[in-house]
Amino acid sequence: MQDWPLRVMRLVDHAEREHGDGEIVSAWADGSVTRTNWRSIAHDARRMAQALEAVGLHRGDRVATLAMNHDRHLTAWYGAIGMGGVLHTINPRLFDDQLDYIANHAEDRVLLYDHMFAPLVEKMKPRWTTIDTYICFDPPADWQGDQAFTDWIAPHDGDYRWVEGDEREPCGLCYTSGTTGNPKGVLYEHRSTMLHALAEVAPDCFDLSTNSTALPIVPMFHANAWGLPWAAPLTGCELVLSADYRPDKMVKLFREEGVTHSAGVPTIWMTMIAHIEATGDDLGPLKTVTIGGSAAPRAMIDWFRKRGIHVGHAWGMTETSPIGTLAGAPRNWDQMTDEEQLGWTARQGRVPFGIELKIVDDEGQELPRDGVTSGNLLVRGAWVIERYFKFDESATDADGWFDTGDVAAIHPDGAMQITDRSKDVIKSGGEWISSIELENAAVGCPGVAEAAAIGIPHPKWDERPLLVVVRSPGAEVCEVKIREHLEGQVARWWLPDAVEFVDELPHTATGKLSKRLLRERFREYRFANAEAMTGRD
């Protein structure tokens, strides 16, 4: 057989050659909408590759972006990698010290950014010591700052051949959100990225085809936008990109562009569902949503199912490129009751080919796949980290297993269910209480917009759960109503010893609930009557 390295620019070539007229729509932050296609994107990416070489970039150099989702950002992905560089997507929601650290640690040479982030860029320039070229994607007409992207690539004709090489060369770099310590870099290879894309388009994963219209609500700066910028050119599907995540704008975009497939974290779906419930709007021909980043509440899954929209519950992390599991339908799906289907979808799904999972106890002994036993979740596979960028030591054990930091159960059919993060499990009387399951049950209570459960020290039980709740707008739900709702949904001894109401919960730069910040906020909190334990005495 021929030697045909799995380099990701072959995906762009394929989309250009076989699906050149496939449309790419960009909804910009200023409300404007632009349209292009795979052929034009590929041509402009070649022009950008020429522009990068003209400013002295070489194979392996890092090219950074600080931008939302739009076609110029997509062009930058392909142009940077096509000239042999490594694309480093920077999350603008990080703290200044983190932005300082990752750009310098990555030794970025070029930064392309959105005008909306210009104040941030100007503030950080003195601290970014390795970047010598700054390009603005979308400057206003009276812009007096860095060179505009279109002007930068204008002198180049696009007569360019992508840099070839080994499929194990790096092509992408993402940093973890760094909830403790400095963020860590994860370096992606051409081969791992290609295999991830091939797995992602399968029916049991994102189920994309040429006839799909995909809209990732995942930012392109977060975990490779869940791989959709590579899965889309593989199929040649139409791609809709939005820099504006306001729910009314998103719902309008779904409907007008005929979006069939989408992916996002629960918080963004919550805002869209609330908008639809308040206005009577709809999501058009949407067929499939993928929900990940944190566990999707059963109430959310049920909301989509009642509207004929398939829910793929996913799990992954920056270290897994990011897809690790996805909830495609099992073989006996049609024989399941509605309640059984809902329960199955609430799990994080099964692995695609290329990924392996197991759970172990604290001594490293493998635990059974019985759907009941929980343990530390380990993963290995074709697109799983081996070591962090610029780290000498391996991130895995001798057999290649990476400790995810999650606690999970694996069912006999292979379906995995996250029960908690290892550091978020509430340890009460020698037993584990899943904060995730408690939170998801609470969110199903009318009037509860968001909920978080954390462990509070207790003199008898070690820890007991505190439930922190954000009410829905205009709702007057109280602790009694929430406790009544939870009765029968969780074990009685899981019931929170107190419920506190707040205006908002803290989130990380990637939109996940920050239990660390929440624990800091309630560090001195103690239950009013610590000896009167509901359901335990």
Question: Which residue ranges define each predicted feature?
Answer:
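Conserved beta-loop-beta connector loops within the AMP-binding
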Residues: 351-378, 412-413, 475-479, 514
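AMP-dependent adenylate-forming
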Residues: 11-37, 141-144
